[in-house]
Amino acid sequence: MPAMVLLLCLALGPALRSARCESTEEYDYDYLSINKTWVLTPKAQETDATQILNSLLKNYDNKLRPDIGIKPTFIDVDIYVNSIGPVSVIQMEYTIDIFFAQTWYDRRLRFNSTLKALTLNTNMVSRIWIPDTFFRNSKRADSHWITTPNQLLRIWNDGKVLYTLRLTIEAECLLQLQNFPMDTHSCPLVFSSYGYPREEIVYRWRRYSIEVSDQRTWRLYQFDFTGLRNTSEVLRTGAGEYMVMTVSFDLSRRMGYFAIQTYIPCILTVVLSWVSFWIKRDSTPARTSLGITTVLTMTTLSTISRKHLPRVSYITAMDLFVSVCFIFVFAALMEYATLNYLVGNKKPLEHSSRKARLPPAGAQVMPSFTAINININNIMHWPPEIEEDEDDDPGSPCLEGKECERFFCCIEDCQTGMWREGRVRIHISRLDSYSRVFFPTAFLLFNIVYWIAYLYL
């Protein structure tokens, strides 16, 4: 049996080796044929591209624009907005990341070849003429260089040139903050030629609209992006007329942050100051400490609200609201000071009035015992004792002094006639009751007018 297996292997061995050799040779042949096809074609194209570039740049002068002295060079521009933000209110600037593309025709770069276009690296940028475009309102600008310079140069066989690059620009945006924080802004990005006037370079928008990336990746934080506009205009200067291109980005502020940080605390502080109207007027420490605390709180809120703004000379919507809230809080404190002052002065005046109405000392000695009793009774029971809580009684003795005569009429002789005409009777002890109605009503009316004016007008 082993002998038969050995004979079978010897008989089939040459056939297996022959088949393996044939398959190996076929595999090598296919690989070589594919490899030759893959290598030879790019090699021919590379040689052709090198010859084209050498011939184009042989007598090319990159210091001269295309068609110089014949006609102006038309530059078609396009912008792709990669991201916008953040926006700095204090510095009045915003950051934008864009892909900036410029297209023009240069007859000196025409070539005849089977190649439709040549896509070149950044080394060729410095060897041909490119527009001297600059951004007029940029404070700082950076071109991206990682991992290689983010620039593209493409030349078509008809002389068309495309030059794109990625830029991050910190541009100036003059914010008008009168309606802060319900404000809207239009932040421009302005560019033009630095040295060529309109007679030599004319900028045109390649498309009517500008593309933007997904806005969810933008870092606008306090703002919402509402739209953009692209325009062109002619700027007249002493050096000539220049084509100026502008892209305006419309932004509206989100006021949720400021509502939580400023508006709601101010409203609650004003409401808290009204609590003193329900505290007894003889609780001087409680009412005074509450009034001073609310005034200091409003001072702190006013300082914090200005922290997010530049030092502008005009009043903003938030400044107006905080100032009015401060006035309400301060008025609540002054209300108790006025009440305490008037009530404190009323008691000495009443005491002096009672003394003035007492009969002279000699009049008390009367020959009749009954008369003495009458006089004593008069002394004991007239004028009647008036409790402090009954100061608002219309029949209470009249206050003497300028306060009484100026602000209300309480003298019996002037209840009718010229003294009463045009006067309003005000009860001092009811000043807290008046304030409980007046302060909330006035503050509510102010809020209605304020929010309608700034949100809808």
UniProtKB/Swiss-Prot annotation:
Q: Which residues lie on this side of the membrane: Cytoplasmic?
A: 340-433
Naming one, the record's GO cellular component terms include:
postsynaptic membrane
Q: List the disulfide bonds.
A: C173-C187
Q: Name one GO biological process term.
A: negative regulation of chloride transport
Glycosylated residues (UniProt): N35, N112, N230
Pfam family membership, one: Neur_chan_LBD
Enumerate the UniProt keywords alphabetically: Cell membrane, Chloride, Chloride channel, Disulfide bond, Glycoprotein, Ion channel, Ion transport, Membrane, Postsynaptic cell membrane, Signal, Synapse, Transmembrane, Transmembrane helix, Transport
UniProt cross-references to InterPro entries, sorted A to Z:
GABAA/Glycine_rcpt, GABRG-1/4, Neur_chan_lig-bd, Neur_chan_lig-bd_sf, Neur_channel, Neuro-gated_channel_TM_sf, Neuro_actylchol_rec, Neurotrans-gated_channel_TM
Subcellular localization: Postsynaptic cell membrane; Cell membrane
Its membrane topology, per UniProt?
A: Multi-pass membrane protein
Tell whether Ligase is among the UniProt keywords: no
User: Transmembrane region positions?
Assistant: 257-279, 283-305, 317-339, 434-457
Complex formation: Generally pentameric. There are five types of GABA(A) receptor chains: alpha, beta, gamma, delta, and rho.
Q: What is this protein's function per UniProt?
A: GABA, the major inhibitory neurotransmitter in the vertebrate brain, mediates neuronal inhibition by binding to the GABA/benzodiazepine receptor and opening an integral chloride channel.
Q: Which family does it belong to?
A: Belongs to the ligand-gated ion channel (TC 1.A.9) family. Gamma-aminobutyric acid receptor (TC 1.A.9.5) subfamily. GABRG4 sub-subfamily.
Write down the PANTHER family for this protein, in alphabetical order: NEUROTRANSMITTER GATED ION CHANNEL (PTHR18945)
Descriptive protein name: Gamma-aminobutyric acid receptor subunit gamma-4
